[in-house]
Amino acid sequence: MTMIKICGLSTPETIEAAVQAGATHVGLVHFAKSPRHVELEKAAELRALVPESVKAVLLLVNEQPEETARAIQIVKPDVVQFHGSETPQWTKAVRDQLGIEVWKALGVREAATLEKSRRYEGAVDRLLFDSPAKKLPGGNGVTFQWDVLAGFEHHTAWGLAGGLTPDNVGDAIRQTGAELVDASSGVESAPGVKDIAKIEAFCEAARNA
């Protein structure tokens, strides 16, 4: 069964909604430029609401080593997701030194981008293929050409992000065979404002794909 991540949650109500709807992962964004940003102390409070059966993912963007370690120490996520220009050396160091599951998001423009993703083999636990970054890394509501994934031999666990909604997630899973799907803006009524009905619809559509 495809795993489901709802990212950019910022209230107890939406955390509960995602869990009840069947999300396997919930994402907390700590990146000041994002409309989904939560301070570390609030992220820790939200993380405490996540049951053991669901994984809490903390999203960071180009943080310094000290801040990364501090964020992980305060929030205590199950997974840290890097969504900036972090190198394989950096992601491997975090995984090895802090003993945490590490994901890396990569913007996909073309098949060549996928080949470049091989640099992260052995340096991350999962790659998240997303739309190319615009003003902000992630959460832009734009899909990419899923057909570039056709025939690509994945050597690392992976997931699909970028403009996924209740209306297109079923097709996305069927076309790509994604192991995990990740929604953020596609389950919002406004930037940073999660819509519980859309969260429920997204999870249902993903389960039924």
Swiss-Prot record:
Gene3D superfamilies tied to this protein: Aldolase class I (3.20.20.70)
Annotated GO MF terms: phosphoribosylanthranilate isomerase activity
Tagged with keyword Amino-acid biosynthesis: yes
Entry EC number(s): 5.3.1.24
Pathway listed: Amino-acid biosynthesis; L-tryptophan biosynthesis; L-tryptophan from chorismate: step 3/5
UniProt keyword annotations, A-Z: Amino-acid biosynthesis, Aromatic amino acid biosynthesis, Isomerase, Tryptophan biosynthesis
Catalyzed reactions per annotation: N-(5-phospho-beta-D-ribosyl)anthranilate = 1-(2-carboxyphenylamino)-1-deoxy-D-ribulose 5-phosphate
TM regions (residue ranges): none
Coiled coil, from the record: none
InterPro entries linked: Aldolase_TIM, PRAI_dom, RibuloseP-bd_barrel, TrpF_fam
Superkingdom as given in the UniProt entry: Bacteria
GO BP terms in the entry: L-tryptophan biosynthetic process
Listed CDD domains: PRAI (cd00405)
Similarity section: Belongs to the TrpF family.
Entry protein name: N-(5'-phosphoribosyl)anthranilate isomerase
Species name: Erythrobacter litoralis (strain HTCC2594)
